[in-house]
Amino acid sequence: MTLSEEISQLHTNKVPSIPRLGVQEYYYWSEGQHGIYAMFGNLQNGGQPSNADIGVYGDTHSTCFPVNLAMAMSWDPELIYREAKAISDEARGFVDKSLFGKSQNNLGELKTNYGYLTYWAPTINLNRDPRWGRSDETFGEDAYLTSLMAAAYVNGYQGQTMDGKSETGYLKIAATAKHFALNNIENNRQGISSNINDEALRDYYTSQFKYIIEQAHVAGLMTSYNAVNGTPAVANTYLVNQLAQRTYGFDGYITSDCGAIRTTYDNFPLGHAWAAPGWTSDRKGYSAVWTNNETGKTISAAAGGQAYAIRAGTCLNCGGGESTVKNIEDAIKIGILSKGVIDRALTTVFTVRMKTGEFDPPEDVVYTKIKKDVIQSKKHQLLAEEAAENTLVLLKNDAVDGTIKKLLPIDASKIHKIVIVGDLAKKVTLGGYSGEPDFTVNAVQGISEKLKAVNPNIAVDFEDTHSATTSTIPAVLSEKTKENIKSADLVIVFVGTDEQVSHEDYDRASIAMPGNLNSMIYQVAALGNHNMVLAIQAIGTVQINFIKDFFPAIVYSSYNGQSQGAALANVLLGKKNPSGHLNFTWYLDDTQLPDMSNYYLTPKQTGGLGRTYMHFLGKSSFPFGYGLSYSQFKISQLKILTKDVTPDDSVKVSFDVTNTGTLPGETVSQLYVAPPEIKGKQMPVKKLQGFQKTKNLQPGETQHVNLSVSVADLAFWNQKELKSVVYDGVYRFQIGYNANEIADSSEVNIQGKLTPKVTHVTLCPEDLVYQVGETINLQSKNKWIKSSINPGLEEQHSVADNVVEAVNNDGSFVDLANAQIKYRSADILVATVSDLGVVKTVGKGITTITATVNGVSGGTVFIVK
C-alpha cells in the first residue's frame, strides 16, 4: 500500500476498498452488547436510520438478551457463553447474502465481499459507583467476577471454547473490550481526568482487561475519552503500550472511542487541551496548535494528537476527522511520527480481519455457513427467556401477618385477583446498545399470560397511577384501583429506572427512587393490603431503606431483555426458583457514596466509608453476592488440607452444599480471602477469589465443590518495588452465601517470595518494512514508544521502551542485560539474526523474528523489499 492508502485504512467509518489488492470496503464500527444493535455500514447499503427504527438498520431486527449487569447476576459463565454464541450467530446471520437479496452487512463492489465482523463489545469497566450512566453495560463492581463473566462472553462471541481455544481456527466475530481505562463517569466524560495510583490502576481498574487478554485473547480494545492522571487515555503510552500491550500481552487492534482523538487537543468539556511532552498548546480548541518548546516549530494539535495516539498503540480513529493524509504527513515531517509506526498499526488491524476469514475462500470458513434463519430464531428466543429467569434476584421473602408460609412463590390456583401498579410494568426497558427485537414481553403481559395459563379465571388489573421516573408531581391512584388493591389477593408494585433517568452521556445525580415512584409506593402501602411484592427493574441500586418494610417480598433485576415480563412471571409463580445474586453493593443512600470524580476505593482515600464490598465499612441494604431462593441451602465440611504455602503454590478448597429446603433449587457458594493487615497499606476487607453455582439440587441433595486459588492471585502492586507482591502473613479463606454471611473459614499462612517467571515477550522495532542489506539491532530502544506522560503529573513508572521486552508474572520487566535471549528467524533467506539480536536483511520476502526469554517467545513480522 501507499502511505495514502495505509492512512485511509486507519479510521473506522466507510474505509475505502483497494481493488488491486483485493481489499474490500470496510466499516469497523458495529455494536452488539446483548444483541446486535447496529451495523452502521448499512447506511452505505441502502439502510436509513430513524428514531422509530434504531438498532439494526432495515426491517430485520435481532434477539435482545438481558444487559451485562443482569447477566452477571446469574453468576453463571456457561450461560453468558451461550448468550454470546447466540449473538455472534446472529452477527454472522446478518452476513447471509440471501438477506434481502443481498447481504444487509455487505459493503463494496467486490464479489468476494461478505461483510464486516468487528464489534464494539463488551463493556468491562467496573461498576464502582451505582450512579454511573452506563452501569447496565458492566458485569458489576468486582474485578474477579467481571473477569470470568467477560471471558466467557468473549469466548462465546469469538468462536472459542470456554478455556479460550479457537474452535475453527477463525474468529467468528471480533470482540472489542472497552473502555481502556477508568471510564466511569458520563458527565463531561470527554474532558475529565481519572486520577489514581498504580496500585488501584493495576489491582482493580485494569485487572479484568488483563484477564481477558491473557485467557480469552480478546481481538480488540477501545481506549476511553477520559484522561488518566492528566494524559488522554487515547494517547497514553504508559496505559496503552506499556500496560495493555507489553505487560498484559495484548496483540490485537486498538480503536479510539468514537471522536476521542479530538479529546487530546480540544478544550474542556470536549477535551483535555493536552500537548505532548516538549510541546505547548495554544488551547484554541478545535483549531489548537502545538509549538515545540525548543525549536519553535508548530503543528496542528489535531495532527499531534493523532500522531501520539498511533504511537501509543491506538491504531484506529473511530469517527474522527484527524486521520488524514495531511495530518499524518505533517507529523512525519516534523518528526513526531514515522512510516514504521503506521505500518505496525496497519498490521495489527489487518491481522484481526484476516483471522475472521475475510481474505480466504468463503467455503473454507465454517462460519459462512451460518444463515439468516438464526436471527431471532426460536432457540434464541427461549435462551433470552432462560437468561432473564436466571438473573432475577430475590431480595426478600417473608411470611405475611404472622402466617408460616412465605409470600412467594404464588399459588395461582388460590389467587382470584392481582393488581399491578406502576407505569414501568407496561414498558420494556432494554438498556444501552440493545438489540431491537420484534418480540417483547412486559411485566403486565408476562404475569397475565402465565397466571391465566394456570387459572383462566384470575383477574389481573393494572393502573399506571400516572407514575413516571421523571415526574415531579404525586402519583394518582383511581378510586377503582384503591378498592381493587384493598381486596386483591396480591399486589405487585413495579418500580425502577429507565433511559430517562440514566444512560450514556448522563449519570444519575442520586440513587434515590426516581420521579414520583415513592409517592405511588406510600399511597399503595397506606391501603393496608400486606400481600405486596415490590418488583424492581433498575440500572442498579435504588434507595429502598425507607420502603422495604412495606413489602414481604422484593424481587430485583437490571434491564432483563426482551422476555423480562415472562421471566418475572415464571419466578413469581415458582416455575423458576430464583438463583440470581447481586454483583454490586446495595448502598442505603447517597450519603454513603464518595464524589464520583474520586476514583480511589479505600475509606482513607475516599474520605468516607470506601467503595465496593472490598473496602466499604458501612451498613448496606444488601451486601455484594446476596440472593435468596425459595429453598434453603447449607454450606458445610470446609476443608483446606495445606495450611502453610508459598506464593508459588495453590490453595485447594473443598466443601459441601446441601439443599435443606423443600423445593429444588440452585445457589451460588462464594469464596472470599481476607488478607492480613500490612503496615502503611489500606488492604481490602476481603476479595472474591472463587465461586460455584450449583446444579439444580433436589431437597436433601448435596453437591461437593472443589475450588482452587493460585496464591499469586493474592498479590498487590507495590509501587516502591514496581512489582506485585504477595505479602507474608495469615490469610483467612472464607466460604459463604454472600460477602457478609460467611458459613465457615480457615486460616492459611503464606510466607516467601513469588518466583519471577516470564509470561510475555514482545518485539517492537521502529520499523517493519526494510530494504535488502539493512542491519537492525534488536538490543536497542524504540524512540517512538517514548512516554507521552508529562513529567511531574504521575508517580514513577517502570519504563518499557526497549525493542525487546519480557515481563514477569509479578508485572516487573526482566533486566535483559542479565538475561539469556535466543533469537530466531523463520526464513533465513529473507533475514538472519545473530545471538546478539542483530538482524540482517538478505532477500525479499516476509519472515518472523522471534526472541525467547526463559522459555517464553514473542515475535514480529519483518517485511523485506
Predicted regions and their residues:
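Glycoside hydrolase catalytic-domain context in secreted enzymes
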Residues: 1-716, 725-741
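Short beta-strand segments
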Residues: 703-705, 744-746, 814, 858-861
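Charged, amphipathic alpha-helical segments
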Residues: 715-721, 785-787
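Extracytoplasmic soluble-region selector
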Residues: 755-865
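Short, surface-exposed beta-strand/beta-hairpin micro-motifs centered on an aromatic residue
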Residues: 704, 722-724, 838-840
